[in-house]
């Protein structure tokens, strides 16, 4: 006997403290995460933290301060118009105005030359190591905003991504699957529609979730159970990239010595800090990108808290205590 499997086609998502759905103007982390379904960058970063081409089909470093970017004009905006080089220039110009969280990405960009409809040359004021990683900001359409102020426009933003904005109505935003998405054959969504409900405060969102008005939300609240209880829902924990750390002034006579910094590292009980301060909701790390990263080498990781190792590290290098 075969059981019929019901495929969920719609999803209700909650977001609090909403500002704008425009990815270049929003400062809301949850909005920016959703925007990745709608808008796309020239380059993405994969699960191993390596760069992958997205809207760009080529990215070439032609000198220490210049890059040639080629795009695919077959990538289409929501209205069916093609992605063009002018869109890249337009987006970077908007970011240079300094009103976006992505503005830092183009801080060293001094100019964008349009070589043809599918090619731009990006010029930098100085060499930026791994500049390709800066090209992860969403691209916006130039022609769509002709004749108006991008920062105050009331138009519904459009992108080239997997989903498109169908409607914005008060405290509700509806996204629908982009059936003409350029990458649909490789990475299609099983969800057809996403209903986004907006809340002025996180407390309202929690209450709405408990009442069953939304299906999913994300939070960094480590005491979440105090607000929504412990039953009636499933929780998925996702490791983030934010971390607390101790920074050393390596120009100091003593701290400039590697053995001193290493000894201090051994002497700090990070596991106890996670337990007593963060209620075991965080994990210890020896490297800023210690998972899913091709640069991470487990062989170089310290053994963690070890007072005896801390002392022996100092003694082995001629220190007395």
Each model region followed by its residue ranges:
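Gly/Pro-rich hinge or "lid" segments in bacterial periplasmic/extracellular proteins
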Residues: 28, 135-189, 193, 203, ...
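Ligand-site clamp/hinge motif
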Residues: 181-226
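Short, well-ordered beta-strand elements
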Residues: 7-17, 66-70, 88-91, 120-121, ...
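Append "and occasionally in soluble cytosolic enzymes with long acidic Gly/Pro-rich linkers
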Residues: 256-321
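N-terminal lobe/hinge region of extracytoplasmic solute-binding protein
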Residues: 14-63, 93, 158
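Aromatic- and charge-enriched surface segment that lines or borders ligand/interaction sites
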Residues: 57-99, 115, 121, 254
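A bilobed periplasmic-binding-protein/Venus flytrap-type ligand-binding module shared by bacterial periplasmic
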Residues: 72, 176-182, 238-263, 267, ...
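Surface-exposed binding/hinge segments that line
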Residues: 60-62, 104-146, 167
């Amino acid at each position: 006997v075969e059981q019929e499997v019901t495929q969920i086609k719609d999803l209700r998502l909650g977001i609090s403290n909403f500002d704008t759905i425009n990815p270049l103007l929003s400062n809301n982390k949850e909005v920016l995460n959703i925007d990745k379904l709608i808008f796309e960058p020239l380059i993405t970063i994969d699960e191993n933290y390596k760069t992958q081409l997205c809207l760009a089909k080529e990215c070439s470093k032609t000198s220490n301060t210049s890059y040639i970017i080629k795009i695919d004009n077959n990538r289409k905006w929501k209205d069916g118009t093609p992605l063009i080089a002018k869109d890249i220039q337009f987006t970077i110009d908007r970011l240079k105005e300094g009103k976006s969280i992505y503005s830092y990405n183009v801080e060293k960009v001094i100019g964008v030359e349009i070589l043809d409809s599918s090619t731009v040359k990006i010029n930098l004021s100085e060499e930026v190591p791994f500049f390709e990683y800066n090209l992860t900001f969403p691209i916006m359409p130039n022609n769509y905003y002709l004749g108006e102020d991008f920062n105050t426009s009331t138009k519904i933003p459009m992108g080239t991504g997997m989903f498109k904005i169908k409607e914005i109505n008060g405290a509700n935003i509806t996204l629908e699957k982009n059936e003409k998405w350029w990458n649909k054959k490789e990475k299609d969504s099983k969800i057809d529609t996403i209903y986004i409900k907006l809340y002025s405060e996180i407390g309202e969102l929690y209450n709405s979730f408990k009442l069953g008005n939304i299906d999913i939300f994300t939070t960094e609240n480590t005491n979440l159970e105090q607000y929504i209880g412990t039953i009636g829902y499933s929780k998925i924990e996702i490791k983030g990239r934010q971390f607390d750390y101790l920074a050393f002034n390596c120009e100091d006579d003593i701290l400039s010595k590697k053995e001193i910094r290493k000894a201090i590292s051994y002497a700090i009980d990070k596991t106890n800090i996670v337990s007593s301060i963060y209620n075991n909701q965080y994990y210890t790390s020896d490297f800023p990108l210690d998972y899913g990263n091709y640069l991470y080498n487990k062989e170089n990781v310290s053994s963690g808290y070890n007072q005896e190792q801390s002392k022996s590290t100092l003694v082995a290098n001629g220190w007395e205590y």
